[in-house]
């Protein structure tokens, strides 16, 4: 199986004084991931969100590095 690129939007919330990631949302394109991340932050009131892409080869269980497309609000240092 060849490598595939996944586009994700990931919300963040303040939990016990720290920032915690929520459930990622899979998107169809980079633009859709950015739009969804912005919506999670602005409309749904999360502390922040990030749109990112990542390559993966599920057959061998290999996941590539995350590539941040856009940040909104407060996110963990992992995405900065």
Task: List the model feature ranges, each with a label.
Residues 23-25:
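Beta-strand-rich interaction surfaces with strong enrichment in secreted/lumenal proteins
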Residues 1, 6-8, 35, 46, ...:
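Generic detection of intrinsically disordered/low-complexity segments and helix-coil linkers/edges
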Residues 11-12, 37-39, 58:
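Intrinsically disordered, low-complexity boundary segments flanking structured domains
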Residues 27-48:
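A short, charged, amphipathic alpha-helix used as a generic interaction element across diverse proteins
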Residues 41-80:
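Short, mixed-charge low-complexity intrinsically disordered segments
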Residues 1-21:
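Short aromatic-glycine-(Arg/Gly/Cys) micro-motifs in beta-strand/loop hairpins
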